[in-house]
Amino acid sequence: MAEPRVFLKENRGRIEENYLEQAKNLPRVFAPVDEKLQKCTEEVALACKYLYAFMPYSDIGNYPFEVFLDYAENGVRLWKENPQVADLPEEIFLNYVLFHRVNEEEIAQCRTYFRAEIGSRIQGMNFREAALEVNYWCAEEATYHCTDDRTLSAISVYRR
């Protein structure tokens, strides 16, 4: 029988170490975060710690914990429910699936919303098929136009 997969096994130590360093630098900010992490599953707490360990200070100061919790919960859910996601190298998963920021866009809770909007449409598809279907869905729903120096968040583009 195959050994059960451990979420972020290769990067767990690095994440914990970097999170503790951030917490040491910003103790008043991280005290309430630590309290909220205690209410999370081990996997979601580790995903949140990754986000907090590597996000810019501006994100730590400008957005509430619940925004990052949404990203963490959805990342863990994808990892648990989709073997293709779980098979990704951890660095790819951390930087391109879990992480909350692409550019300079506003950070918004959007993954739960988009999962509800498109999840059933791509269920059971392989990565290639799902990527194409998401692109078709995006073309049906929104056309992106850069309006200023900042990039709009995905949810802002969708709601236009």
What label would you give each PLM region?
Residues E90-R159:
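Secondary-structure boundary elements
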